[in-house]
């Protein structure tokens, strides 16, 4: 049985998701908070972050060599270019290159600003120069903007395919779920800290390490599901597949 194209292939992504979440929970339970943070989050240099980068980097050649899209050559090239752009920006984010570039260009602004400059409050601050804001806007446009545009383009097709148990749609759904988990775990410590009126160093170490494990682990899961969706789509469709790329 080919796991990519069988009638039960839609179950592959959820099974991987459950196994991944269970593994992350186990790792969090057995590791000390400080050791876990060192292994998962060291500004792009930790073991897990370094291991995640090839997953995102592999998306770029894979989407061109195993094109999952149908239609004209121009359409396929534009969609592959969009996927490549998002994957490249994901590598930039994982390695914290965007923060390094901002720090190099505007060191005084970054030093005075509490937290990362890649936040909405950075854009709304009156003390931040227009050039620095433009860099942040460009980052958001290339990463989240292109991703959102592609998601909206395929939203109706993916929704129909999801309820028809299409493997690609379920892999994309798990990818989206991983992305939501990453954002939630990134914000959760700050939300909880503000709600309790605590200082940053008063957040319980176990809670902080839990969020770190699922945030960084979720980024690897996201990349893995993207690779799986590309492989499934390429395996399922013939060279003359329909223009929408999903036969639903």
Predicted regions located by residue number:
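Polytopic alpha-helical membrane-helix bundles and their juxtamembrane interface segments
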Residues: 2-91, 99-102, 106-247
